């Protein structure tokens, strides 16, 4: 039992390999991310065949996968427009890998890779750099007009330029911090409640029922948060891509 709520986020080495020139380790965070990647691979593999799945052969898994695929497809179409086919594989991949990474952390003694700020921040910075490159390749220097709204008075140009630049850079951090903070806070709360349940297991039944009910409710809430955060990440990525394709 973990008595320190933050102990669950400790990165521990499972296997270490040392050579003369470098060292390589498999940590618990890496292991669970590999598990999430393997699960995501099978979801991708099945999703690729969705248009060819027979109505007769459908089961609960196929219905769930198809629902996820069509939900993301609809969102990408609405946000990006005519060029949605180019970016649909990227957005769906991000949605699934983040969703599965969030969910594996709900397994008892599991580890959520997205609870570590390094992974979400690395992904978010990569996304912002990529959409900036997309916009720069399409519009060249004109792309930087996104930092200066049209009709801005000349006297406000320096101030607005700094504000818009900071706002643009903040996207790279807010996207990752939002995900990591939500997953981390939920796991900490669940750990505190489960620790309280463990300590009160020998007391009167009334003192166990209330925390246990709260624990079940919070677990359900965490499940919803895991799905919503993956969806929010996907829709924000679509918005950033759209902004790089269409200058306002």
Curated annotation (Swiss-Prot):
Pfam families: ATP-synt_A (PF00119)
Membrane topology of this protein: Multi-pass membrane protein
Domain of life: Eukaryota
Gene Ontology MF: a single term: proton-transporting ATP synthase activity, rotational mechanism
Propeptide position ranges: 1-3
Gene3D superfamilies in UniProt: ATP synthase, F0 complex, subunit A (1.20.120.220)
GO terms for cellular component: mitochondrial inner membrane; proton-transporting ATP synthase complex
Subcellular location: Mitochondrion inner membrane
Stretches that traverse the bilayer: 24-44, 86-106, 117-137, 146-166, 183-203, 205-225, 227-247
Alphabetized UniProt keyword annotations: ATP synthesis, CF(0), Hydrogen ion transport, Ion transport, Membrane, Mitochondrion, Mitochondrion inner membrane, Transmembrane, Transmembrane helix, Transport
HAMAP family hit by this protein: ATP_synth_a_bact
Task of the protein: Mitochondrial membrane ATP synthase (F(1)F(0) ATP synthase or Complex V) produces ATP from ADP in the presence of a proton gradient across the membrane which is generated by electron transport complexes of the respiratory chain. F-type ATPases consist of two structural domains, F(1) - containing the extramembraneous catalytic core and F(0) - containing the membrane proton channel, linked together by a central stalk and a peripheral stalk. During catalysis, ATP synthesis in the catalytic domain of F(1) is coupled via a rotary mechanism of the central stalk subunits to proton translocation.
Similarity remark: Belongs to the ATPase A chain family.
Subunit structure: F-type ATPases have 2 components, CF(1) - the catalytic core - and CF(0) - the membrane proton channel. CF(1) has five subunits: alpha(3), beta(3), gamma(1), delta(1), epsilon(1). CF(0) has three main subunits: a, b and c.
Protein name: ATP synthase subunit a
Top-level taxonomy: Eukaryota, Fungi, Fungi incertae sedis, Zoopagomycota, Kickxellomycotina
